[in-house]
Amino acid sequence: MLGLKGCLTILIGYVIAVCALFSSRGRNPSLTDWEKLKDQKISNIDNFGLTGQHLLEFFQENLPFLSFSEEKYRHKHVSLYYDVFKEYILRRANSKKCLPVDSAIAKLNKDVNPMPVHSHNDYWRKLPLFEGLAYGASSTEADVWNIDEKILAVGHNEAYLDPVELTLDKLYTGPLLEILDEVNCQDSDSDRKNGVFFNSPETSLFFYIDFKSDDNELTYKLLMEQYFKSLIDSGYLTYYDMKKDEIIWRPVTVILTGNYPTSLDILDNGNDNGYFESNQRFAFLDAPLLSLEPKYSKLSVAATVSFSQLMKHCGSDHWKVSLRGRMDSNEISCAKSIIDGAHALKLKTRIWGAPTWPANLVETISRQIIHDLGSDLLNLDNLFMASSLI
């Protein structure tokens, strides 16, 4: 029979166990795990079992522990967050083992459906390319500047470019090639290519290249002969087949916007049979939505207009819409007819420059653009908001 001292010992132990149980329920389990494993190197971990938004949140919450004992992260390339995330995502991309189900795409967006959203100013995000793919955004963009006639740096303002780390190949074309090689390893010679969305491998990623430099001809030459060449050689870029007079869809569709060249002589390198004399054109023009012509059905896959231009064309003003809080029936009818005209040419549509504040106005106008006007790509900076509106 237990004495008083023994009973008290058991009771105290029981109380401590119960308190520990309830206190652990109030803690972040992922953070608790990483507090215990903070000496574990991220390079020893292949898959956390998280995808999409949950993966992004996990990295943001646990970044100090994920990089705690990694000497290589002492000197950043883009940022600590980007460097650690990219290393984790692409770790197995260059391995000899062919296993698409455990690929970078599987880590990024398994169980995430592609959404008709354009990742506006994607290069400004903490994780260029990767964040948009994690949310399932089916369109992205990069502003490019020609540096020393040989480097395409990515950035919004010429004064803040980094021609060493923030370049088109390091942020976009390089990772895209690794990702696509990984999910097409089983039959690399097949005409059927898997894309960058796990749940929808047939969906093509629209990749807008915004020309910023004056010498657009040289920029285009660098794109074709340097930055996109490996993607072209691997069969990953959508192209216009000059012989068949049709568009052949592939995992990535390049759309030129901004100060891009429009001359076919430049686009096809002075040849009648395409830039590489293969009867293929691998870049499409961002067509002007308000002045479409039949020729754009072959030159383009998408047409764009700013919200202010669209409202002005419809006899209104974007400030009136903002003050009212929504587009009225006349504005909707006019804008929808323009979008229907683009659809008749088999072009997708994108409207940029819609109100960005306050949040309720953004949500209302965004829903009207997608649901009432029938526009194809919602142009938003906030991907979390976009995912809740589609």
UniProtKB/Swiss-Prot annotation:
Domain of life from the UniProt record: Eukaryota
Q: Which residues form the signal peptide?
A: 1-26
**Any one biological process term the GO annotation gives:** lipid metabolic process
User: What InterPro entries does UniProt report for this protein, alphabetically?
Assistant: AIM6_PI-PLC-like_dom, HAT_RTT109-like, PLC-like_Pdiesterase_TIM-brl
- Give the keywords, sorted: Signal
GO terms of molecular function:
phosphoric diester hydrolase activity
Query: Is RNA-binding one of the keywords UniProt gives this record?
Result: no
User: Which family does the UniProt entry place this protein in?
Assistant: Belongs to the AIM6 family.
Q: What is this protein called?
A: Altered inheritance of mitochondria protein 6
Give the organism the record lists.
Answer: Saccharomyces cerevisiae (strain JAY291)
